[in-house]
Amino acid sequence: MTNWNYQLTHFVTSAPDIRHLPADTGIEVAFAGRSNAGKSSALNTLTNQKSLARTSKTPGRTQLINLFEVAEGKRLVDLPGYGYAQVPEEMKIKWQRALGEYLEKRLCLKGLVVLMDIRHPLKDLDQQMIEWAVESDIQVLVLLTKADKLASGARKAQVNMVREAVLAFNGDIQVEPFSSLKKSGVDKLRQKLDSWFNEIPPQEAVEDAE
């Protein structure tokens, strides 16, 4: 199994919606989460780059789908943050439609990383993202971010509670604590990404079967 070097990850392009994304080939893994879930920090920690994904002081700034290449045909996709109160309702609906469309229609999407603040997990939109992924047979890794904010006992209790709760989705869902500050949980994230990126791209599997 190849262990991909995530430090080589570089920005490729931004797209306002699925129609403007590059060709639907290779393998993509998407990162999704509420606007304050620590998504940009997690991407920066994973790649050991300070500003690969810009951390905005204004949640909800990232309205584009941002694509980063790990290696040829292997991409990380930073989806727009969702659930920020000060974004107009019309824009919220537009984003949610774009997120749903991406999860349902993007053939090269292999896995979804859903990031949630460990203190406030499984909000409605988090559950919606997991539901969309499960409906599309996409594996999910839930990262409970800012795990350093809780003492060890409370952290374990939250992780166990979320692991129990996601059983109701009947999907392939892994739940892990994560802290960008302490760099904890990064190994689990890399292992999961490696397993996704080492699979045969869907379109190549179809060609082999013909």
Curated annotation (Swiss-Prot):
Keywords: Cell cycle, Cell division, GTP-binding, Magnesium, Metal-binding, Nucleotide-binding, Septation. One of its GO terms (cellular component) is cytosol. One of its GO terms (biological process) is division septum assembly. GO terms for molecular function: GTP binding; metal ion binding. Its cofactor is Mg(2+). It comes from the Bacteria. Gene3D superfamilies: P-loop containing nucleotide triphosphate hydrolases. GTP binds at residues 33-40, 60-64, 78-81, 145-148, 178-180. SUPFAM superfamilies: P-loop containing nucleoside triphosphate hydrolases (SSF52540). InterPro entries: G_ENGB_dom, GTP-bd, GTP-bd_ribosome_bio_YsxC, P-loop_NTPase. Mg(2+) binds at residues 40, 62. Residues 25-199 form the EngB-type G domain. Pfam families: MMR_HSR1. Necessary for normal cell division and for the maintenance of normal septation. Belongs to the TRAFAC class TrmE-Era-EngA-EngB-Septin-like GTPase superfamily. EngB GTPase family. HAMAP family: GTPase_EngB. This is Probable GTP-binding protein EngB. The lineage of its organism: Bacteria, Pseudomonadati, Pseudomonadota, Gammaproteobacteria, Enterobacterales.
